[in-house]
């Protein structure tokens, strides 16, 4: 019997799950109810369907989170425990929000129900919510491996390898060693040939290394990397000569026939309708000859067909390439049009026949050389296998793993241990997953292993799958969708189409674009009635014509600054941003729109700085979610890194000169030149030593002042170098800050707070680096240098940001959010197609497709010893086409996500020359959709939308184009923000007469007299908290150690006033965050840095407050005696326990209720261990012990009364010092 049946077979009789007929009854009742916001029939079905796999396809804004919460709540009300549900979310933040919603609904249900048994059950679920399996798949697999990793020999004391620079460093070390081993054993030169194939003429192995990383990373997204590499990566038959011959004889023959039949129809039409007017022309005889060649095609094989093609091309090449061109000069307009149409059609046909000829030539050539690539491919696969194993061995040795490793360990544990797998399959009543469209194959395998085969609940929307770069595979969702659609016995498919977010103008525009853009061929799904958005409430259907979607196009009238070249990059321009600024000013001034309701979406953060500078010019507040990572390039950090480089190695000339010129030492160009001239060769440090002794080639250039400056520098540097040998990098950095006042110096510069935050973060990152197990300045510098060399900069430090401001974020960041006004910026930006030019393209199904560097010396008459030609193998070409469709489909989904963020109004923003754009698009369409060839050939959102506008110009597309020129963007026409007026001072003449004021003052005086008379009773609250009691007793407690001064002596200090607008973080804020963190911390598993940070992520506090919490100190607490006792007795643990106690005030003898929340206690049979967290700053622990003695005594008395236990041991956990301290309080 599984856990579900055991729980439901208890004493309490829970309601049974609804049958299909009962669900229909609920749907009918809901439809006829008078609710203002009714649940849809599909939402009800998704909430109550039970006993089978369910896939919910939830369109944007359809309330999928509402459905999930309601479904979970329904299961809890029917006797299922929260611990019997496995709920996977895409992000930690989403998990926290889901828990909050469940908690809120549970509290509401508990308050409403009168059934005491149900209340007890739901209260138990509320208490267990923090321990429930609601989180990311990564967090679950981490817990699973911590608990059961012993079965694979994995220590539970592992850490997560999250730092990209550390990962890159480890991978490089493993690769270099393996590369050297392979090179040493390469007797026949096969490995050198492999490396040359991917590195070309470069002298290093970087090209080959990137290929190895690429294949390795792809394999990690599969459920079994080793199995995929061995069984799928190399598919030898795809590289065989037989495969090309088969393609030429079968598939390609049909392609050639199709083109020739099209040509026959075209030329035959021209002969029939043009004989009378052009029959005597020279080209006409050539056309008739071509028609003769286009007869009897069915009986020809592929080789004969290509001979016909070649003969047609030869005929066309006559008369200098005009053999089939109508060169006549008719005067009749109809004949002119007929001639031009013929010439254009003929040119396209000849071009397509040439392409066919080239394709056949390349395939024939490939047939001889492609097979030579197979041994290299096998060797590449073997190298990647060895690299993957060696890399994993290093991570095992370091006890540091990537999330992908943890996922694969978890899969192995469940696959190889039937008892563990059975435990989880029996434990979970249902396996639920949110954002199912973004699952990868490793996560899908985990869900399969946790499920019993008929208890999966999956929610997602394939149209919002935008994480292919993380190896998410939307086809996992689509295959389930099609399976359940075709065979309901396999599972239930439920469509949530109603959108409850956007007004009808947004929905209609989105549908109009996507019904004409997305289908199975390009888009991977057909956007039809199944996927179209429908307004979910009557209010959304009320038309607001002014909110029709607008396509704002910055008209680049200067043709020299505009281009419609498909290959030319189109960066965001100042003109486009001015267009948006102008509209935002209008929205704010005329429609009263708040800045916080407006969001700008971009595809990349590359141009965030430009956007923010222009908005700042117009006074528009704006907040960005981050720019291009440039932390290591910030000037203050670069100077400190150069300082560390010099400390590590004074012979580093570049770093040394940078340090000398820095504000810390201020050597100028003249002084540096004088030093440099003291010796012709050698390092600059050596020249400084020579200059100091005035023994160089030009001692006359050295003044006493300069020599002293050099002496001071060398002395400081020697001192720093000696200090660095004995202390941590963190201490070294702060020593430099303090001795040279550099931290204070940058604080006085523009953006000083940001610069100081950067320096502070450098110290923290150095400290974090040393906690990973790595030690030493040289290794830290090497890690930083590798990060810079690999363009792996660190994230910028965030500052406090204004609340009422326009938001600027990427489309990816906006997913799941909603905003009243949305501007999609730079839609003429080209898609990122870099992966189309890789030397290896990978398909999950077809394996590796590679480019092969063939030696064609035998085909080419050349004096050179080798003639190497880079060939795209057939598998490479097939994988490239698959990749192109996948990338274009992803871009369509990205556009869909962007458009569906808007609630009220949507703006698209692009640019181009109006005249050129009008001529660019051909208007081709097929079956109500933009022509496939058109969609495949385009590489911007703008091209797609304007091509739709051209192809379907006679239809209502629910958006309007607005061209904006520079003349529309003058300072006068843009306008200025109208700020809200300040409150004007009140005038006495506008208020009541003076006698009324006098009467009011008399009444207030009498009230004051009464207040003074009964002050004691008035100030006694009926409810008090322990903190209030503590404050009451504090003056008395502190008197014992009080010294009375004869005379007041003010402290002679001067503190600069704080002019920053950033609110200070108070101790109370940090304390509240710490308390919430300790409440959220899951103590049922091993407490690690990752579990603490995961809990910290869910804490409701500003990031700046969270940054003040010392995670290491939290970890250190669980290494104390009390911490270990708590972990060993979680069954006796009570956290955040509310209490109430009746007390008597010692002054007024009035009764009052003391209420509070105890941080935590362990309840034993004969005694209680009480503990409380304190984040106060202190010099000696006894200070806090005395300060909180009275408060702890109140807690202890309340517990004694509640449990009838006399012994309560009290402890304060002090988190406000330099290290963790646990102090026992005597009461």
Swiss-Prot record:
One of its GO terms (molecular function) is ATP binding. One of its GO terms (cellular component) is cytosol. Residues 37-503 form the UvrD-like helicase ATP-binding domain. Keywords: ATP-binding, DNA damage, DNA repair, DNA-binding, Exonuclease, Helicase, Hydrolase, Isomerase, Nuclease, Nucleotide-binding. It holds the Pfam family UvrD_C. One of its GO terms (biological process) is double-strand break repair via homologous recombination. The keyword Hydrolase applies. Belongs to the helicase family. AddA subfamily. This is ATP-dependent helicase/nuclease subunit A. It comes from Streptococcus suis (strain 05ZYH33).
